[in-house]
Amino acid sequence: MAEITAKLVKELREKSGAGVMDAKKALVETDGDMEKAIELLREKGMAKAAKKADRVAAEGLTGVYVNGNVAAVVEVNAETDFVAKNAQFVELVNATAKAIAEGKPANNDEALALIMPSGETLADAYVNATATIGEKISFRRFALVEKTDDQHFGAYQHNGGRIGVITVVEGGDEALAKQVSMHVAAMKPTVLSYTELDPQFIKDELAQLNHAIELDNESRAMVNKPALPFLKYGSKAQLSADVIAQAEEDIKAELAAEGKPEKIWDKIIPGKMDRFMLDNTKVDQAYTLLAQVYIMDDSKTVEAYLDSVNAKAIAFARFEVGEGIEKKANDFESEVAATMAAALNN
């Protein structure tokens, strides 16, 4: 039997990322053959990864990488926040973002087939990470954003990397693009413009807003406060030319009823129309970047602010770790119970 020296164990650890005891056991089982030991560790890693496959990984990090006119934002998950701070995990996240920005895959399958600098596929890198770190490590999603030479990327990560944002701004500079990314991180828009909102989604959200007004009016009635009006519209998508024209006619009728002289109507109507637009685009304000009040200047929307500096938002991508993942509170308890049951049955 070959002598398993500390130097040999160290070499295997450096090549495989395995722990001391795992590396030593692999060398003993393969009689000191380095290549066979690496393959054995890989097989064991796949087995460990398979055992962890049904666990919920809802913690993790986002990664952002800019490669010329292409940028990538990725989300990589782990089971605990503690592991999300692990240096090996952070390195994997950054390497994933870089590989995707450079490889420009079309979907997750193509992304996982990318070859890493180590020579392994991205998929194998995750199998090995799961084995060596000891938790389920999973690549969840990515977005690629592209720009032209005269546009600017704004790359931003918030809350220790739990939120990752890329924006594209035309005009201005990289600093402005980063400010817009900071806004996106804080205000959570889902689309750029109202034109991207689904009509049924707008109707559903408007119904929710009116339900909230109904509940508020019940409370107001108890203290003899006047009821708030219900919203008829929620988005610019619902404000046709006829609707806007009718709103202006209604304002004129209101001014006439109040006895306001016609010669000052032109000074009053624009402000009232702005109020009409504000009151009837609540869904846009919640979900579309351009309609949101800009956090850097709350006197303007994002669109109005960018217009004022001769700039324009072109695109953005925002990931927040764990979005849409149902995290089961009893995962750990279930795992312990299953382990104890297995032990009793053996």
Swiss-Prot record:
Please give the function described in this protein's UniProt entry.
Associates with the EF-Tu.GDP complex and induces the exchange of GDP to GTP. It remains bound to the aminoacyl-tRNA.EF-Tu.GTP complex up to the GTP hydrolysis stage on the ribosome.
Which GO terms of the molecular function aspect are on file? translation elongation factor activity
Q: Which PROSITE patterns match?
A: EF_TS_1, EF_TS_2
Q: Which family does it belong to?
A: Belongs to the EF-Ts family.
* Record's GO cellular component terms: cytoplasm
Which keywords, in A-to-Z order, does the entry hold?
Answer: Cytoplasm, Elongation factor, Protein biosynthesis
Q: What is this protein called?
A: Elongation factor Ts
Q: Which Pfam families match?
A: EF_TS
Its localization reads:
Cytoplasm
The UniProt annotation puts the region (Involved in Mg(2+) ion dislocation from EF-Tu) at: 80-83
Highest taxon of the lineage: Bacteria
Taxonomy, top ranks, is: Bacteria, Bacillati, Bacillota, Bacilli, Lactobacillales
Name the species this protein comes from: Streptococcus equi subsp. zooepidemicus (strain H70)
Where is it mainly found? cytoplasm
